[in-house]
């Protein structure tokens, strides 16, 4: 059941759609504006090959269609991939979701998952898109080139790919209950949170469910567009821009009898990378340095010790609002 008092506003209200085929300076300005105002936008004409997208989606569908015992067997210890069902993190958060989680830099899964080729091609494509968006961001902010993209280009980058499958309601309630008016078919598939990494590049099938929180604290439903990628600012990018960009709070709901599939690339830096406000961002903004300097490993450890909805960045502020 969906809880909370936040009001839901119209679908796609104020969500920027950025055409990556436009003139470069125009694209960079639009990205900066979107990151400042909402921390979320869609990109079209992004250059990711449709064959790569389709292969990834079909192989994911094939995997989640397997019997439960086969899927649950993909939970090896100390491996860069795993299957999960309902459990989100290690602190009691749960949702109406099953997922596959891959560490993008370790090839150990290649011989064990039948769709490894599709996964590898997809990772390379969205990683390149993330780097391009981050370089355009740096240009729009007038900070040194590759200030952001260098962190995810390293061979040691701690990026992950997560494939979420939100099954139809009858798998949770049973077909007999679907006609019961007292049973709400709208559930929280993945609870309210921000992403701790630098940037997230997400694509979903034609089924809705994603919502983002705007500056008024209202939920904006994002219409599904399989031809576009959704991009959102993560906690680390908010820190590096000294709070100029917004790490947007978002969640996923499940509706009715349709199955939703989403694939998210979380662009993260190496564990030892030092993260803090860029000097150029502190000098150009009329406010003090808002965040301490820390390593991604330190932040990741602290962040994952909290619940999904907790405000992780508060632990690393240098001054209180």
UniProtKB/Swiss-Prot annotation:
Binds 1 Fe(2+) ion per subunit. Induction: Not regulated by auxin. Down-regulated by paclobutrazol. PROSITE patterns: FE2OG_OXY (PS51471). It catalyses: gibberellin A1 + 2-oxoglutarate + O2 = gibberellin A8 + succinate + CO2. Fe cation binds at residues 193, 195, 250. SUPFAM superfamilies: Clavaminate synthase-like. Expressed at the base of the shoot apical meristem and developing leaf primordia. Keywords: Dioxygenase, Iron, Metal-binding, Oxidoreductase. Disulfide bonds: none annotated. GO terms for molecular function: gibberellin 2-beta-dioxygenase activity; metal ion binding. InterPro entries: DIOX_N (IPR026992), IPNS-like_FE2OG_OXY (IPR044861), IPNS-like_sf (IPR027443), Iron_ascorbate_oxido_reductase (IPR050231), Oxoglu/Fe-dep_dioxygenase_dom (IPR005123). The keyword Cell division does not apply. Pathway: Plant hormone biosynthesis; gibberellin biosynthesis. Its EC number is 1.14.11.13. The active site is at residue 260. One of its GO terms (biological process) is gibberellin biosynthetic process. Catalyzes the 2-beta-hydroxylation of several biologically active gibberellins, leading to the homeostatic regulation of their endogenous level. Catabolism of gibberellins (GAs) plays a central role in plant development. Converts GA9/GA20 to GA51/GA29 and GA4/GA1 to GA34/GA8. Belongs to the iron/ascorbate-dependent oxidoreductase family. GA2OX subfamily. This is Gibberellin 2-beta-dioxygenase 4. It comes from Arabidopsis thaliana. The gene is GA2OX4.
């Amino acid at each position: 059941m969906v809880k909370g008092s936040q009001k839901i506003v119209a679908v796609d209200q104020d969500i920027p759609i950025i055409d990556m085929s436009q003139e470069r300076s125009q694209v960079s300005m639009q990205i900066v504006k979107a990151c400042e105002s909402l921390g979320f936008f869609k990109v079209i004409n992004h250059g990711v090959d449709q064959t790569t997208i389709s292969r990834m989606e079909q192989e994911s569908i094939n995997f989640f269609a397997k019997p439960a015992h086969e899927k649950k067997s993909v939970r090896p210890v100390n491996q860069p991939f795993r299957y999960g069902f309902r459990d989100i993190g290690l602190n009691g958060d749960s949702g109406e979701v099953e997922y596959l989680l891959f560490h993008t830099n370790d090839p150990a899964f290649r011989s064990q998952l039948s769709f490894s080729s599709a996964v590898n091609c997809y990772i390379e494509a969205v990683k390149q898109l993330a780097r391009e968006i981050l370089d355009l961001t740096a240009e729009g902010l007038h900070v040194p080139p590759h200030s952001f993209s260098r962190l995810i280009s390293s061979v040691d980058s701690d990026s992950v790919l997560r494939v979420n499958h939100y099954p139809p309601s009858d798998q949770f309630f049973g077909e007999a209950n679907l006609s019961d008016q007292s049973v709400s078919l709208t559930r929280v598939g993945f609870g309210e949170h921000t992403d701790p990494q630098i940037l997230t590049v997400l694509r979903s099938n034609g089924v809705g469910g994603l919502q983002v929180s705007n500056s008024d604290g209202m939920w904006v439903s994002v219409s599904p567009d399989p031809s576009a990628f959704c991009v959102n600012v993560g906690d680390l990018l908010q820190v590096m821009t000294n709070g100029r960009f917004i790490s947007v709070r978002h969640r996923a709901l499940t509706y009715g009898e349709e199955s939703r599939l989403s694939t998210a690339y979380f662009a993260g830096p190496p564990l030892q990378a030092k993260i803090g406000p860029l000097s150029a961002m502190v000098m150009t903004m009329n406010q003090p340095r808002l965040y301490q300097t820390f390593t991604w490993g330190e932040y990741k450890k602290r962040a994952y010790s909290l619940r999904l909805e907790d405000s992780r960045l508060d632990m690393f502020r240098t001054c209180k609002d």
